[in-house]
Structures are given as structure tokens and as C-alpha cells.
């Protein structure tokens, strides 16, 4: 169905097309999708102690304002992450700010945390009970004088309605946000988050979303701090500010974060590096180029326990979860695997 309309959709400005997709989901205009593997035990797993049907999640960025998370569960996603949400409403960067690189199966975006703000998003979620496992991705306002406190505001606002909260320190589109990968700043942030959780008497799982553009020494430092603070999981990784050399589309030099297929190989390498350092004590959610059973399989082999996608759905359409599960099942059956968790971390570089 999607393939028939793809060429027409791709003639529309990417951000406009995205807004139309949100409206369609909000109005339940998407087709009923058949998924013969919906209840297949091969994909059953737990995330933060809660049963989910499969390990395929919707990444933050698609449903920024928590408008359609229940519709996304209907599309088959095992979990959904909304946001990024900032304390105050924020327009983001000037348009155009999203670019579709069709030949490269990639997007470049410089949206800049455009969202309605934590109060509006919180009210929306409280009035529309989530029907699946819901994560909320939080970040600071662009012009904030106290970005550390912005994260704490997000934690206070959402700790009692989310199944987990993601601390986003990795978007390339908010100036100096990635400075939180610095050892001292990251440790300070994690300490404040821990203290705030104690004040709130909250056991909300904390996830940290990592940049792909970090050095090996930073990976080691971050892993040490993540283990010290007993973070529940990490997301590897966000969009990259680089990696443009092999792209074919004329838009490849647009400023912003690159997502999709060109990110896959580097993301998998980064997952492996974190997997070896975290030693199964912190789970990894793998992101970057997930659009098929094969690409999900590679993430699990590298060390991810779950995967997320966004760009893949832009190019493959709303049936992508069913497609991935069908293809992944064929691979696992061929290899004699009964549940995907058996292969997590089984392929590491020498």
C-alpha cells in the first residue's frame, strides 16, 4: 500500500509530510495491518521489568508532542518514546529544517527540539492513558540559563507517568548540548538526577541517549560513570553531525543531524564498544539504520537488547515492524534460535 503512494509523498516537503502522517495517525486513517507474528514468543521480552511483545521501538523525534503514541502501538511497536520535550514551549530552528536524501535512505534534520513544552505534553499524556510501554525523552531549552535544572524539571514533570525517562545529551542541533559528554559535566548531571529521584521517591528507570560522534576515551569514561550511577539503559546512538563523505544526494552538506542507513555501520561499532565495557550490567537500545530483519539482527549481535527506528519508517512505511519481524524470524529459524535474546552480543570484533 505505502509503495503506491511513496513517490507522491516524497514530492512533499519532509516536515509537511511528517505533519500529515501525525494527523493521519491521530485520526486513525492508517490501514489495518496484518502481523502474523504479533504474539510470537520468538520476540517476547521485558523492558525495565515490563512484558513487551517485541524489542522494536519508535525512537524519539517522531511523536514529539505525545499526540499519537497509542496509534504507534497499533502499528506493532513494542515500545514508544516521545519527545524530545523541553520545560518551555520551543519553536526550534528556522525552516526548512528537514531534508530527505532518497538515494541514501537518510534524513538530515536541524529541528532544534521543537515541542509544546513539558506542561502541555504532560497534560496530554495524563488525559490519554498509554496502552503500551511509553518512554519520555527530555532535554533543555535552547536559551536556558540552567540546563541542568531543565533536566530536573523534566524528571519532576514526567516521573509518575512515564515507564522510563531518557536524558538527551546528544542532539547536534542544540548548541553545546553535547558538552554533557564531558566527564565532569556528565557526572554532575547524573548525580543531580539521582538526588532528584530520591526527593521524588521515584524508581523511574533512567536512560541516556549517546552521541555517535565520540572518541574511544570518551566511551570508556562514560561507561564508568554510567555503571557508577546504575543507569538503566543507554540509547546508541543519536544522529551524527558528520559521516557525509559517502552520501550521494545533493543535500548531503546541509547542516544538521544525519539519520538512517548511513549511520548503521558506525552505530553498530559503537554498540559493540559499549557492550564490552558495560558487561551486561546496563542494557543497550540500538538505533541507526534499522529498516529490515537483517539490520535489527546486526544490532542484536553487536550487543543491543532492543532497537529503535524512525527514518526506516519514512522510507518503508507503517508496516515496518511487521516486515522486520517477518524477516528476522526467517534468520533466527535458519540459525536454530528460539528467542532473539539468545544472540545478543554474540558477534564482537576481535
PLM region descriptions:
Residues 2-45, 109-114:
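An N-cap/entry alpha-helix motif that binds or orients negatively charged groups
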Residues 13, 58, 80, 121, ...:
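Conserved, mostly hydrophobic/aromatic
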Residues 22, 26-29, 33-38, 172-185, ...:
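Glycine/Thr-rich beta-alpha phosphate-binding loop at enzyme active sites
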Residues 51-57, 130-138, 199-212, 276-286:
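Short beta-strand/loop segments at the ligand-binding rim of alpha/beta enzyme cores
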Residues 65-72, 152, 214-228, 276-280, ...:
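Catalytic cores of alpha/beta
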Residues 78-90, 169-171, 233-242, 289, ...:
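Glycine-rich phosphate-binding active-site loops on the catalytic face of alpha/beta enzymes
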Residues 83, 88-133:
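A gly/proline- and charged-residue-enriched helix-loop-helix capping module
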Residues 89-105, 243-259, 313-337:
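C-terminal helical cap(s) of enzyme catalytic domains, especially alpha/beta-barrels
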Amino acid at each position: 500500500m505505502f509503495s503506491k503512494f511513496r513517490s507522491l509523498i516524497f514530492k512533499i516537503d519532509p516536515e509537511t509530510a511528517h505533519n500529515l502522517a501525525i494527523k493521519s495517525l491521530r485520526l486513525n486513517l492508517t490501514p489495518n495491518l496484518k502481523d502474523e507474528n504479533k504474539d510470537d514468543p520468538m520476540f517476547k521480552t521485558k523492558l525495565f521489568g515490563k512484558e513487551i511483545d517485541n524489542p522494536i521501538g519508535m525512537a524519539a523525534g517522531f511523536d514529539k508532542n505525545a499526540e499519537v503514541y497509542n496509534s504507534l502501538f497499533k502499528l506493532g511497536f513494542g515500545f514508544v518514546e516521545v519527545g524530545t520535550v523541553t520545560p518551555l514551549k520551543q519553536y526550534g530552528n528556522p525552516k526548512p529544517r528537514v531534508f530527505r536524501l532518497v538515494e541514501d535512505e537518510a534524513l538530515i534534520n536541524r529541528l532544534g527540539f521543537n515541542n509544546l513544552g513539558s506542561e502541555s505534553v504532560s497534560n496530554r499524556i495524563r488525559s490519554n492513558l498509554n496502552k503500551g510501554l511509553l518512554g519520555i525523552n527530555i532535554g533543555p531549552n535552547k536559551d536556558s540559563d540552567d540546563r541542568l535544572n531543565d533536566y530536573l524539571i523534566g524528571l519532576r514533570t514526567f516521573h509518575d507517568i512515564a515507564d522510563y525517562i531518557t536524558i538527551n545529551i546528544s542532539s547536534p542541533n542544540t548548541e553545546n548540548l553535547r558538552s554533557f559528554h564531558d566527564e565532569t559535566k556528565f557526572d554532575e548531571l547524573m548525580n543531580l538526577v539521582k538526588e532528584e529521584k530520591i526527593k521524588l521517591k521515584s524508581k523511574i528507570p533512567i536512560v541516556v541517549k549517546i552521541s555517535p560522534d565520540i572518541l574511544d576515551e570518551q566511551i570508556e569514561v562514560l561507561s564508568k560513570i554510567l555503571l557508577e550511577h546504575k543507569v538503566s539503559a543507554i540509547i546508541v546512538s543519536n544522529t551524527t553531525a558528520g559521516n557525509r563523505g559517502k552520501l550521494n544526494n545533493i543535500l548531503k552538506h546541509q547542516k544538521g543531524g544525519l539519520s538512517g542507513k548511513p549511520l548503521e555501520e558506525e552505530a553498530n561499532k559503537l554498540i559493540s564498544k559499549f557492550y564490552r565495557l558495560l558487561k551486561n550490567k546496563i542494557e543497550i537500545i540500538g538505533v541507526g539504520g534499522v529498516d529490515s530483519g537483517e539490520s535489527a539482527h546486526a544490532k542484536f549481535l553487536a550487543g543491543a537488547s532492543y532497537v529503535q527506528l524512525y527514518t526506516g519508517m519514512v522510507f518503508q512505511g507503517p508496516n515496518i515492524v511487521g516486515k522486520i519481524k517477518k524477516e528476522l524470524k526467517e534468520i533466527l529459524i535458519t540459525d536454530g534460535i528460539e528467542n532473539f535474546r539468545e544472540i545478543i552480543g554474540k558477534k564482537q570484533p576481535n
